[in-house]
């Protein structure tokens, strides 16, 4: 499969509460053959900043992440599956399949949010009213995700970009609890639910000429976007293709020694970085 995908070769499968079971059944069928899972979330922004004294920037970043994830709700999750060669599943169709999960819990009328973030999501085509009406029940999704084979599985490689918040929202959903107080405990949960994680923003540290966010990196690597920016399905596909191009161009051999690190957080393999 070429990294230069065309819009008409991709099907972004919109998942709502009424088709959640059948789409999760498809995912269960593809994960063994396509064990690289690129992930992106959309959420209502960052609404609070902690005050006080912190030992490090990483401690401050985690406290900010924890506080916001605990009071906010995920709006959308995108998943793109691929294999070692970068091929995507077709699920018996003539198109490559990407999944976009739409959640119901966020309420524009009663929940706190960052106005600029919500306006950006609206401009990107996310219909918050439809999410409220037809969106997925998070607890039901968590139950299906737990039995899907994509979490708690060391053979699955999670691929992300600057993904502390993405994993924060998924952990909150999977555990039905607020995030732990300490980074060390947070990473213990990461290691249980997502044993193999690659954060592209961390990998970029080892590629001297690369910088910027996901869109800038994709542009530098000549990876074209399919779909709409700031929608989780399209962003997860761009993450997947960018990871593949980065791996091919800058790394030789397995990447395992780079796994388990989330950019901006000061914990590696459960140990707080000094």
Curated annotation (Swiss-Prot):
Binding site for a divalent metal cation: 40, 42, 166, 235
Tissues/organs with expression: Expressed in flowers.
Cofactor: a divalent metal cation
Entry GO MF terms: metal ion binding; poly(A)-specific ribonuclease activity; RNA binding
Keyword Nucleotide-binding: no
Sorted UniProt keywords: Cytoplasm, Exonuclease, Hydrolase, Metal-binding, Nuclease, Nucleus, RNA-binding, Transcription, Transcription regulation
PANTHER family assigned to the protein according to its UniProt record, in alphabetical order: CCR4-NOT TRANSCRIPTION COMPLEX SUBUNIT (PTHR10797)
Subunit structure comment from the entry: Component of the CCR4-NOT complex, at least composed of CRR4 and CAF1 proteins.
Family as reported in the entry's similarity comment: Belongs to the CAF1 family.
Protein name per its UniProtKB record: Probable CCR4-associated factor 1 homolog 6
Originating organism: Arabidopsis thaliana (Mouse-ear cress)
Name of the gene: CAF1-6
């Amino acid at each position: 499969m070429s990294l230069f995908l065309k819009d008409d070769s991709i099907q972004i499968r919109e998942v709502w509460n009424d088709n959640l079971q059948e789409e999760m059944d498809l995912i269960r069928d593809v994960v063994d053959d396509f064990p690289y899972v690129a992930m992106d979330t959309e959420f209502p922004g960052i609404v609070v900043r902690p005050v006080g004294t912190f030992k490090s920037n990483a401690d401050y970043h985690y406290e900010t992440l924890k506080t916001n994830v605990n009071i906010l709700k995920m709006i959308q999750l995108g998943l793109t599956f691929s294999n070692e060669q970068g091929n995507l599943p077709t699920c018996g169709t003539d198109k490559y399949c990407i999944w976009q999960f739409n959640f119901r819990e966020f309420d524009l009328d009663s929940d706190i949010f960052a106005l600029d973030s919500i306006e950006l999501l609206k401009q990107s085509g996310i219909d918050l009213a439809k999410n409220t009406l037809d969106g997925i029940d998070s607890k039901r999704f968590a139950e299906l995700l737990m039995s899907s084979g994509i979490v708690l599985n060391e053979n699955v490689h999670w691929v992300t970009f600057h993904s502390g918040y993405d994993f924060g929202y998924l952990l909150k959903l999977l555990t039905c609890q607020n995030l732990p107080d300490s980074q060390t405990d947070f990473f213990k949960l990461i290691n249980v639910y997502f044993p193999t994680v690659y954060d592209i923003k961390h990998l970029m540290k080892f590629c001297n000429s690369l910088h910027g966010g996901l869109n800038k990196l994709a542009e530098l690597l000549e990876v074209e976007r399919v779909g709409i920016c700031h929608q989780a399905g399209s962003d997860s596909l761009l993450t997947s293709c960018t990871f593949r191009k980065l791996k091919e161009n800058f790394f030789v051999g397995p990447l395992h020694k780079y796994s388990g690190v989330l950019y901006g957080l000061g914990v590696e393999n459960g140990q707080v970085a000094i």
